[in-house]
């Protein structure tokens, strides 16, 4: 469809969903995403206020020969296919939040971010299985898996989901769960947003009676020493303790705390479901190295949202990630050398997985577990002439250094278009394609890391 087939801002039903076309006053704001290198150019953008608006948006898209894709907060937008001929359904206005503390159950609209929920849960002594940034949208995070500080004890966020509300490709509003359309429910929990436009999800949260969390800061020159101590420690750690090591090059900005401003550190981050004294005993081999800063303390669960020190403002960046069966000792010196290069990389991070993330539950969704015990993530800011090539080269070096331990990929951390079949075993991928064919045979709904409809024999 040509761009001029979608006219100026208009209602697609009386009092209904507003649709933007290229050139409309609010167009650029509605298509903006977290990664400033991504320039999304959909055919049209729908701005639904409620479920009825989403139904209308899908209907109009189909009438005009457009496909549809959902986007709430703009994280992970780089993994979408080109948006030619696609209506972007901007779900950021679907912000309803309901918390049932007694049932330990939360229902959120598709535009809700973790920052809108986590502090309220903490006041109730509860926590969700959110990830490293409070700015990330709950729906997209949950559909793609979801690993965070409590995941070694409680598993993937997608498997804490108890119901999904969505508009299907043929315009029906459904609520699916283990008893209602269980095969579609299975696909949605880990298979992403290719099966319908999700309007809300409902998920379980967990009690947190006591939490110790914080970070141990070492000068970046000690990265190899820190990584060796950390990897030696991992086999002895209980599921209640999650640790990450991150090499971070802090910018020289006034907003950055003076203690770290303009400096580079190897940081051991930890979250423990228990008392600080026990956490310190478990982490003794690392603490005994003598960190420059020790910020481990008893915390509220709300502190988990900022523990990783992720940026909350949009940035221009490229990333690389991988799930590893381990961090091999023979790679540590090379990894430390690459991570220390502040001219190309801002962050190199290794997350301890394992625990509940490695165990397959019979009731799990399409992403049941991770294939390895360590998750690697690297990020470089692309600023200035030649930066793109420099950052990509250094990220490729990092990937090559850990390649001997490569066990698979985790979709939520892959921020470029990829063959989504690589995220699943053959049997799971076959099943996902069949679910897609049952619910969207014309491949109208496009997800990040898209699952296509399997051609029928």
Task: List where the protein language model places each region.
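Soluble FAD-dependent oxygen oxidases
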Residues: 1-457
């Amino acid at each position: 469809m040509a761009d001029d087939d979608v006219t100026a801002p208009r209602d697609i039903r009386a009092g209904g969903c507003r649709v933007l076309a290229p050139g409309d006053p609010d167009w650029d704001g509605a298509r903006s995403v977290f990664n400033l290198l991504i320039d999304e150019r959909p055919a049209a953008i729908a701005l639904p206020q409620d479920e009825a608006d989403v139904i209308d948006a899908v209907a109009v898209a189909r009438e005009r020969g457009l496909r549809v894709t959902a986007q709430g907060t703009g994280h992970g937008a780089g993994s979408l296919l080109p948006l030619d001929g696609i209506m972007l359904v901007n779900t950021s206005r679907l912000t309803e939040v309901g918390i049932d503390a007694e049932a330990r159950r939360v229902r959120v609209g598709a535009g809700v971010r973790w920052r809108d929920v986590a502090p309220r849960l903490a006041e109730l002594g509860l926590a969700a299985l959110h990830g490293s940034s409070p700015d990330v949208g709950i729906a997209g995070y949950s559909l793609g898996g979801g690993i965070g500080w409590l995941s070694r004890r409680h598993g993937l966020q997608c498997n804490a989901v108890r119901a999904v509300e969505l508009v299907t490709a043929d315009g029906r509003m459904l609520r699916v769960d283990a008893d209602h359309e269980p095969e579609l429910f299975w696909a949605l929990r880990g298979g992403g947003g290719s099966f319908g436009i999700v309007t809300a999800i409902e998920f379980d949260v967990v009690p947190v009676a006591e939490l110790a969390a914080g970070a141990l800061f070492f000068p970046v020159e000690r990265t190899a020493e820190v990584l060796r101590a950390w990897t030696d420690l991992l086999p002895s750690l209980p599921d209640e303790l999650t640790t990450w090591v991150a090499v971070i090059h802090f910018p020289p900005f006034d907003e950055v705390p003076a203690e770290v401003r303009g400096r580079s550190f190897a940081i051991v981050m930890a979250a423990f479901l228990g008392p600080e004294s026990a956490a310190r005993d478990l982490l003794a081999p690392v603490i005994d190295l003598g960190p420059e800063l020790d910020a481990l303390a008893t915390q509220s669960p709300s502190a988990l949202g900022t523990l990783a020190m992720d940026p909350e403002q949009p940035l221009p960046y490229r990333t690389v990630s991988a799930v590893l069966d381990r961090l091999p000792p023979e790679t540590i010196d090379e990894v430390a050398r690459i991570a220390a290069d502040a001219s190309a990389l801002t962050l190199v991070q290794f997350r301890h997985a394992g625990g509940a993330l490695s165990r397959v539950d019979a009731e799990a969704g399409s992403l049941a577990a991770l294939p390895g015990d360590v998750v690697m993530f690297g990020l470089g800011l692309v600023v200035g002439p030649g930066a793109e090539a420099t950052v990509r080269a250094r990220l490729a070096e990092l990937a090559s250094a850990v390649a001997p331990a490569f066990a698979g990929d985790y979709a939520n951390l892959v921020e470029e278009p990829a063959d989504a079949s690589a995220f699943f075993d053959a049997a799971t991928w076959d099943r996902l394609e069949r679910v897609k064919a049952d619910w969207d045979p014309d491949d109208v709904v496009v997800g990040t890391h898209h699952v296509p409809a399997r051609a029928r024999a």
